Regions:
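A glycine-rich phosphate-binding loop feature that marks nucleotide/adenosyl-phosphate handling sites
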Residues: 119, 140, 158-161
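Secretory-pathway/luminal and periplasmic proteins that interact with or process carbohydrate-rich
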Residues: 3-5, 148-152
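Second-shell residues forming the walls of enzyme active-site clefts
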Residues: 1-124, 130-135, 142
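Compositionally biased amphipathic helical and low-complexity segments enriched in hydrophobic
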Residues: 27, 103, 145, 153-155, ...
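Flexible, glycine/charged-enriched surface loops at secondary-structure junctions
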Residues: 129-138, 152-157
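Short amphipathic alpha-helical coiled-coil/interface segments
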Residues: 140-147
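Caspase-like cysteine protease fold
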Residues: 150, 161-162
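C-terminal cell-surface addressing/anchoring modules of secreted/extracellular proteins
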Residues: 162-189
Length: 189
């Protein structure tokens, strides 16, 4: 809204403060959260007067975790806008953008510029501890909970006749995230 730049072609910035954003730009988000929205898409807009990190909202822990989850109370799935957009791909390598988005609190990383590089970057970040396994598991649980709520299968098994409690999604998360990576790695071999 409050920018003349398109994130598809460059860096979009709003100079609004957090309070100004809450008074106008965030009203639809607050209404959606109050109505039970399951997913929020994080834009690649920088907000220098609302956060001091200088990052696009989609890569900002302050914006996604502290503000969206903490202050606004959103508990659903956070999806980034397309990571191949110039606001991200002109400034970050695919692996760096993917790791930053996960550490910021994003659950789904939409369209990285190079999926294989982003995937390998996340795998390496988990293996080295740059992304905590539990952080990745939080995203898996949120996504599985959303799938269960929608009546979608949680894996290769047929969907349950009746949705079960959200605890079922938690049980579906493997002990080690590396167990999830085997089939994905096979795609790139």
């Amino acid at each position: 809204g409050d920018t003349g730049e398109d994130s598809h072609s460059g860096t979009a910035t709003t100079n609004q403060t957090w309070e100004e954003m809450q008074a106008a730009a965030l009203l639809p988000f607050e209404a959606g959260i109050a109505a039970g929205a399951d997913v929020v898409m994080a834009a690649h807009i920088t907000t220098p007067n609302a956060t001091q990190d200088g990052l696009p909202a989609s890569l900002s822990y302050t914006m996604l975790t502290e503000r969206l989850r903490g202050e606004l109370g959103f508990t659903g799935v956070i999806c980034t806008d397309a990571l191949e957009m110039k606001a991200i791909s002109s400034h970050y390598a695919p692996a760096d953008a993917a790791v930053a988005a996960l550490n910021a609190g994003a659950d789904i990383l939409l369209m990285p510029a190079d999926l294989c590089a982003a995937f390998e970057g996340v795998v390496q970040a988990v293996e080295t501890g740059a992304v905590a396994e539990e952080r990745l598991n939080e995203s898996v649980r949120r996504i599985l909970t959303l799938k269960e709520k929608a009546g979608l299968p949680l894996g290769t098994a047929a969907p349950a006749e009746e949705p079960t409690a959200p605890e079922a999604a938690e049980e579906a998360v493997p002990e080690k995230p590396s167990a999830c990576f085997g089939w994905l790695r096979a795609l790139w071999s």
